[in-house]
Amino acid sequence: SNDDPVTDLPVLPWEEVRDMQLAGGWKDLDNCRDTVEAAGQLIELVGVADAHADDDAFPEVAAGESAAGGASGAVVKIGVTHAPYQRVLDQMVADGAQLILAGHTHGGQLCLPGYGALVSNCDLPPAQASGLSTWPASFKAIHKGAAPASEEGQAYLHVSAGLGTSPFTPVRTACRPEATLLTLTAR
């Protein structure tokens, strides 16, 4: 059936999927803040809805809290966004995020061996379309060097290439699908 005349693809049942995830304990970070506890440590989360669709609205800081200060007792603040647009990344860094997790780019999807992504499908530099770098980017970080994020004004950025492809370009070239498992350890 033609549920979406723009793409001729069926509309995904995202609301039902979200409701099932929430029932299972998932955190909905669409334009929200929340916390989780892992190994007895509090982790602060801040997220936005899909910036590619202009659905993002950076969540306000609660009265009496400092954006960079974060949740009381949190050991780390993690920003989560589907699409790593620069405006969102800048807001997350200004908010005190130390790590930002993103997707959307499919790793560039069409890459050249030895060069990498040709495009990022957002305003992120193509060299940052997948993997770990820093934001704001340093020259070394976007060329896969070991540039550490500073304590203030910079965050680690991890963009997953993901498993799928764009419905408009359903092929990958020199860009393997990936599911990422990150392990965070104390400094």
Residue positions per predicted region:
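N-terminal post-signal-peptidase region of extra-cytosolic proteins
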Residues: D30, D56-V61, L118, C122-L124
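Beta-strand-turn-beta hairpins that frame and shape the catalytic cleft
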Residues: W26-K27, R33-L45, G69-I78, W135-A141, ...
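Histidine-centered active-site/metal-ligand motif
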Residues: S1-P5, H82, H104-H106
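Conserved beta-sheet core of the metallophosphoesterase superfamily
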Residues: P84-T180
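Fold-independent oxyanion-binding glycine-rich loops
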Residues: N31-C32, V48, H82-A83, A161-G162
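Extended active-site neighborhood of metal-dependent phosphoesterases/phosphodiesterases
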Residues: S1-D56, A68
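Active-site-proximal loop/helix segments of hydrolase catalytic cores
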Residues: A51-G70, G79-I100, C111-L112
